[in-house]
Design a protein with these regions (language model features):
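Acidic/histidine-rich helix-loop elements
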Residues: 5-21, 122-133, 139, 166-170
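Short, catalytically relevant binding-site loops at active-site mouths
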Residues: 117-120, 163-167, 198-200
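Soluble or luminal CAZymes and related metallo-dependent hydrolases
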Residues: 17-24, 42, 93, 139-143, ...
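Active-site-proximal beta-strand elements of phosphoester/diester hydrolases
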Residues: 1-14, 112-115, 154-164
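Structured beta-strand-rich core segments of catalytic domains in phosphoester-bond hydrolases
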Residues: 36, 42-153, 237-238
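Metal-dependent phosphoester-hydrolase catalytic domains
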Residues: 106-112, 168-169, 173-176, 180-192, ...
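Short, glycine/charged-enriched secondary-structure capping and boundary segments
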Residues: 18-20, 51-54, 73-74, 172-173, ...
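Active-site beta-strand/loop signature of hydrolases that rely on acidic residues for catalysis
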Residues: 3-8, 25-50, 101, 149, ...
Length: 259
């Protein structure tokens, strides 16, 4: 099984510009029919398009809803405002979503969602970790979630997008929570935990000690496997995601072959 994860950066490029390439990114990373693809930072309006662009089953969920300042907005208005300058506004108006794409050769039996930075969890972990007040307040700024699907045969695949915080214990806490949740869903069956962990192994005190999971690779984008054999990390070279003089996203896709 080919498993990939990619933070789409809202369809933006490096360097950022006034055009987005969400469709091009989705088609690029799914053109050779991988088994599973986990996306983070998907524009919410694009969720309805993913199935047509990829030819895969899709489970998507909006994590951060569209807003204009403190006021709620709509998906379409968020898109229109963001399209004025996507590289500048990013998710400021339209929010962001996550998605798991599954080959049509498999059947999704169940779908699950976990809010990683729920209020009770933040309060409890903030006290336990002794986090500064400003760090605790910032932790609540944007809802972060982990999605999971249960497939025919029992395999569970989870996709998380952890909080991007200066203090590495914040994403660590969310990663540990997502891992424990995934293990609980899977029971004795194999499971995969993929996504943008927003912390690398050099700063994390959690990633290398998750119960039963395979070793993480470099960077903040990871694919961890339990109960199956995982091949080496394949982090795409810049050339594989280049469009002219532009690099698609500020993250490279990561893939692992699972047997």
């Amino acid at each position: 099984m080919i498993v990939r994860t990619w933070n789409l950066f809202h369809g933006n490029t490096v360097p950022p510009g006034k055009r987005r390439y969400v469709q091009e990114m989705v088609r690029l990373v799914t053109h050779d029919a991988p088994d599973f693809v986990c996306f983070q930072e998907v524009p919410p309006w694009a969720l309805d398009q993913l199935e047509g662009w990829s030819g895969m089953h899709v489970f998507g969920q909006v994590a951060a809803r569209p807003t204009i300042g403190p006021l709620p907005s709509t998906t379409e208005l968020g898109r229109r405002l963001t399209d004025l300058h996507p590289g500048l506004f990013r998710s400021g108006f339209e929010g962001q979503a996550n998605a798991i794409l599954v080959t049509r050769e498999r059947t999704i039996l169940a779908r699950y969602v976990l809010t990683l930075n729920s209020l009770g969890f933040r309060l409890r972990e903030g006290r336990r970790l002794g986090l500064p007040l400003l760090t605790r307040l910032a932790w609540a700024k944007e809802r972060r979630q982990c999605l999971a699907v249960r497939l025919d045969g029992g395999l569970v695949v989870s996709n998380l997008h952890a909080t991007n915080a200066r203090h590495p214990r914040v994403p660590d806490a969310e990663v540990a929570r997502a891992a424990g949740w995934t293990l609980g869903l899977a029971g004795d069956e194999p499971c995969i935990l993929a996504g943008d962990f927003n912390v690398d192994t050099a700063r994390s005190v959690v990633i290398d000690h998750l119960d039963g999971f395979s070793n993480a690779g470099p960077g903040v984008d990871h694919i961890l496997v339990r109960g199956a054999s995982a091949g080496p990390y394949d982090r795409w070279t810049p050339e594989r995601r280049r469009l002219g003089k532009l690099a698609l996203s500020d993250h490279a896709p990561v893939e692992v072959v699972v047997e």
